Amino acid sequence: MKIFTSNQIHELDQYTIEHEPIRSIDLMERAAKTLARAISDMWTVETPMVTFAGPGNNGGDALAVSRLLAEQGYQITVYLFNIYQKLSDDCATNKQRIIESKRVKQFTEVTQEFDPPKLDSNTVVIDGLFGSGLNKPLSGGFASLVKYINQSAAKVVSIDMPSGLMTEDNTYNIRANIIKAHTTLTLQQKKLSFLFPENQQFIGKLKVLDIRLSAEGTEKIKAQYSIIEENDIRPLLMTRDPFAHKGTMGSALVVAGSFGMAGAAVMAAKACYRAGAGKVTVHTPRKNNEIVQISVPEAIVNLDHEETYIGTAIDTEDFDAMAIGPGIGQVETTAIAMISQVRRATCPVVADADALNIISNHRAWMQQLPKGIILTPHPKEFDRMNGSPCADSYERLSKARTMAEHLEAYIILKGLFSALCMPNGSVFFNQTGNAGMATAGSGDVLTGIITGLLARGYSQGDACKLGMYLHGLAGDIAAKELGEESMMATDLIKYLPKAFERLKD
């Protein structure tokens, strides 16, 4: 699913109007019917409703929705804010229609200060003040109204966007002036700002409504951002040759674990095997030998000459993919071995955890990373790589995109909607996964899965997309059977086979 910017949303609307063809007012009516149906599914006609409509097309949507609901018997009080005596054409048309219908309980056009109505816990507020076209923080009377609504006990349903929230960049927005919706009914596609954790408090329950915008237009408009869906993933899956053997299924190297952190090596290696690798070699300190041999008997163990930390780089000519970083620590000897290992790699590399922290501590080494390397930071790890904290998720994503292009790397910003930043500037969001995965070791498992897929022969981009999706899907299956509260990272490995099978069904 493509994610469009506010300008592209307008472009798609215009494409639909021109090529369907359909008048813009009729397209608004079609959207309003879909919105009204969704609202009537949530609340009965006995529910009192208050609509706050702005002067633009979002307000036009709200007026049309209110009229349609009133025609069904809902008792709706409508306020249209026309402070500057300038309505969009379609908003003006819907103002006239709502007046002529005489079905709403009360219609008030606000042209100056007004006393807001009482909003109690039985009331539903239809928020249609501002939508995807908003490009600056709310201020003045609109900001005061938003605060009044937020402080009330009413349930709020926002049309397309919670008023005050911008479609992409909210770095310098005033968060106190954004509607906190109970439900957001967004039109056609999710918006970029919906995928950032700091904005979840405004969105509430999200429903995406299909208003039948042009499929041809959607295909033609090039989007920088996309959400990975199951239909995108299924075609990527390789089949196993019935004549395959371990030598043809890919050989992976996992450089992981200092003494006391052998679990990171174990989880990455197990996940690597579960992702389909034919052979997995674990390079780890000597004191981890027994733990790794017992925990992953399938693995080949290559012991470092150091007892408790990794101090040497090994040859990678016999490997098809390499993971480095989980649990290796950050002592200087390990740091030197790590960058040497990465520089001399002859296969695709996945760098995670301490490998990323080492790079952050030796920023000049960043330019020595091989093209096509996969970096998998969580937010704090990325901020350290960036050299300074990011103000919010949008800024972090923007900087990660720039870094991925500059380094010609693949960067996965981990989180609820993990974002894969590609070397060409495009970004793919993963929508599988849940809060039960917020536990130590989940990142080691992701590293192992991606490395196993690389060893199998997937390209870096496909391995990242498939790896993120499978990782989250395994978590979703585990949560359904175990509950989020009690999940551990090893459960992701346990349920990875079921995730594969789900995709093959």
Question: Where are each of the predicted segments found?
Answer:
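A short, aliphatic-rich alpha-helical micro-motif
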Residues: 119-123, 178, 316-317, 342
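Internal gly/pro-rich beta-alpha loop/helix module
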Residues: 122-124, 129-223
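Small-residue (G/A/S/T)-rich helix-start motifs and N-terminal tracts that mark the onset
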Residues: 1-82, 88, 183, 194-349, ...
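Short acidic loop-to-helix transition motifs that present clustered carboxylates
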Residues: 112-114, 161-167, 192, 307-309, ...
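Nucleotide and nucleotide-moiety/phosphate-recognizing core
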Residues: 36-129, 137-159, 337, 345
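Short acidic-hydrophobic sequence patches enriched in Asp/Glu that either
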Residues: 87-90, 141, 176-179, 488-491
